[in-house]
């Protein structure tokens, strides 16, 4: 094993699964903040791949300041209309000229952003419901980093940190899978469900409350009774889904702000609240593992859109999560591991200033019994840090 600064220590408190109160949130792919995350990351991958294809290197860029300004809509039973379009501004920096060649960075970004919206949002008319704009400052050619050269370890661009944890608790699994399956397989056969699905899980002792906000699509809602049926169907689906992950009691609540007497309901024309007064920004929603987990250490860094070569705010959050998963899967006797990686600007990213694992072990297993195995697993993952860059560019790792 190398001389990397790796620490392993026992956690001072209970595993999250054993705490009295647990809160978990996920903002779905159609939430305005997550729309920004998705576009920023898609544009990031497109730029990185273009640079590799043309120059064999990932040049300097960042797209992690993407913003969304909500539109205005008039939803109605059977189908309403968008009155003022959603405005999306892809903001950042990109290298537009390198080695004597000009690079159409803005055009690449615009195409990637529109392709993402077209793929993810079937109820959004790209011709009239949304405006996509791109504003890139010039990146620095001096900050280029060669990607793909064996033994080339990038230097950290910042003194910053990333965090990750494993395994997911029952509540975390329920929350993440509820959104992913509602906006995935369920929405495919039930198009009344829009892409803006927000899920909040609260576990109090052995009872889990799952509160789901679902943007219903007005085109598929002819009247209030049909809306009520759609809400009831979602509730039943999520209840059955939750039972796959827990034996605890689960209560599912759907669109709790509805007032049926006043016919004030969560009805949308496009399937996202971005059509009506809900703005968005990169990094204000899900962390790198797709969840918001106030019971856990979290980084405030926006992971999506950052350069995947040496930007610590991206790499260390993704790597911390991968390390935690590897430790939980490969080392016997681990009940919970929470990982922190701290960089120092200018140092190789495979040599963090400190790599710290805080561990809860199973009954009868002391941390000292497994410390060497944990350190070895962390060391192996750090040695392979550049694989995070490859996975991100190829789209194998999600950042939101």
From Swiss-Prot:
What's the family? Belongs to the AdoMet synthase 2 family.
EC number, as in UniProt: 2.5.1.6
Enzyme class, top EC level, equals transferase
InterPro entries attached here? AdoMet_synthase_2_family, AdoMet_synthase_3, S-AdoMet_synthetase_arc
Q: What does this protein do?
A: Catalyzes the formation of S-adenosylmethionine from methionine and ATP.
Which residues does the annotation say bind ATP? 137-142
According to the UniProt record, which cysteines are disulfide-bonded? Answer: none
Query: Which keywords has UniProt assigned to this entry?
Result: ATP-binding, Magnesium, Nucleotide-binding, One-carbon metabolism, Transferase
Transmembrane stretches, start-end: none
Protein name, as recorded: S-adenosylmethionine synthase
**Which pathway is it part of?**
Amino-acid biosynthesis; S-adenosyl-L-methionine biosynthesis; S-adenosyl-L-methionine from L-methionine: step 1/1
What is the catalytic activity of this protein? L-methionine + ATP + H2O = S-adenosyl-L-methionine + phosphate + diphosphate
Q: Name one GO molecular function term.
A: magnesium ion binding
Cofactor(s) required, per the database record: Mg(2+)
* GO annotation, biological process: one-carbon metabolic process; S-adenosylmethionine biosynthetic process
In Pfam terms, one family for this protein is AdoMet_Synthase
